[in-house]
Structure formats: C-alpha cells, structure tokens
Amino acid sequence: MAKKSMIAKNKRPAKYSTQAYTRCEKCGRPHSVYRKFKLCRVCFRELAYKGQIPGVVKASW
C-alpha cells in the first residue's frame, strides 16, 4: 500500500510531462500498472477472478 502522501502527490498535475507516472487506482502501486485499466497486475488479477472487470475472461486453449 502506498503512503497517503504519495497518492496525494500523484493526483497533483506534474510540472513537466516527463515527470508523470502511472499508479494503481486501487492500491497506489507504482510498478506494473496496466494503462487501459489503471490497475496494477495484483489488483487486476483479484478483480478479474471476481468477475468485476467486464470482458475479461481466463484464457484457456
């Protein structure tokens, strides 16, 4: 879990466009964030297993 100060800092607009970085909307994790869903891989997997992300199904072949 990210510190509250880091989450608040991320919500502010960056001074320069290169300073902006993605953070998970649910837990605030800065690494391995899927831009399309704005979730980290851990949160994405949890929500996908629960069926809370529409259109996402477990792959089987």
UniProtKB/Swiss-Prot annotation:
Q: Which residues bind Zn(2+)?
A: 24, 27, 40, 43
Q: Mind listing the GO molecular function terms for this protein? A: rRNA binding; structural constituent of ribosome; zinc ion binding
Q: Name one Pfam family in it.
A: Ribosomal_S14
Q: Which keywords does the record carry?
A: Metal-binding, Ribonucleoprotein, Ribosomal protein, RNA-binding, rRNA-binding, Zinc
BP terms from Gene Ontology: translation
- Give the cofactors, semicolon-separated: Zn(2+)
Provide the cofactor note recorded for this chain's UniProt entry.
Binds 1 zinc ion per subunit.
Q: Which domain of life is it from?
A: Bacteria
What does the entry list under GO cellular component?
Answer: small ribosomal subunit
For whether the record's keyword set contains Lipid metabolism, the answer is no
Q: PANTHER family, alphabetically?
A: 30S RIBOSOMAL PROTEIN S14 (PTHR19836), SMALL RIBOSOMAL SUBUNIT PROTEIN US14B (PTHR19836:SF26)
Q: How does it assemble?
A: Part of the 30S ribosomal subunit. Contacts proteins S3 and S10.
Q: Which function does this protein serve?
A: Binds 16S rRNA, required for the assembly of 30S particles and may also be responsible for determining the conformation of the 16S rRNA at the A site.
- Give the family this protein belongs to, as stated in its UniProt record: Belongs to the universal ribosomal protein uS14 family. Zinc-binding uS14 subfamily.
What's the protein name?
Answer: Small ribosomal subunit protein uS14B
